[in-house]
Amino acid sequence: MTLSSQHYLVITALGADRPGIVNTITRHVSSCGCNIEDSRLAMLGEEFTFIMLLSGSWNAITLIESTLPLKGAELDLLIVMKRTTARPRPPMPASVWVQVDVADSPHLIERFTALFDAHHMNIAELVSRTQPAENERAAQLHIQITAHSPASADAANIEQAFKALCTELNAQGSINVVNYSQHDEQDGVK
């Protein structure tokens, strides 16, 4: 199937976790003739969320759009769907990965996302988990962020700002910046 004849749909399914639920959803997607291009699954409390980017012919996408709400009701799932298009990813010459461990309190995740925003970086992935307080230890927040920068300079400048924010918040943090143009030159690719 040519790219122009492909159609795309983003689906989010949210509901109580139980054995076999993800298989039931993916089997329904396949039975409609759709392909799962990309997906993410997360457990949040007793709920799960399953996000998928589907591709297929116009007929396949229309079939999943018309049948998934019924399947969702049958499985007691909240289903959200939105048509989208394929687009080439713009070049991102630098990527940044950070991990942070800090005593939990409100606004911490916002502080780190604001840091990336101030450096014009696109957050591609954000994972956070809170460990409950135990004995004498306060609740701990663990944050992982992956971000991409359209400008190498923004990625280089974020290192010092990240370290300063970790110091201000009394957080333990690590940052890894990869500048792909430098990385390629080291590997002999220009």
Swiss-Prot record:
It is found in: Cytoplasm. Keywords: Cytoplasm, Repeat, Repressor, Transcription, Transcription regulation. InterPro entries: ACT-like_dom_sf, ACT_dom, GcvR, UPF0237/GcvR_regulator. Disulfide bonds: none annotated. Its main location: cytoplasm. Residues 10-91, 97-176 form the ACT domain. The keyword Transcription applies. Gene3D superfamilies: 3.30.70.260. SUPFAM superfamilies: ACT-like. It comes from the Bacteria. One of its GO terms (cellular component) is cytosol. GO terms for biological process: DNA-templated transcription; regulation of DNA-templated transcription. Pfam families: ACT_6 (PF13740). Negative transcriptional regulator of the glycine cleavage system operon (GCV). Does not autoregulate its own expression. It is not yet known how GcvR acts as a repressor. It does not seem to bind DNA. It could interact with GcvA and suppress its activatory activity. This is Glycine cleavage system transcriptional repressor. The lineage of its organism: Bacteria, Pseudomonadati, Pseudomonadota, Gammaproteobacteria, Enterobacterales.
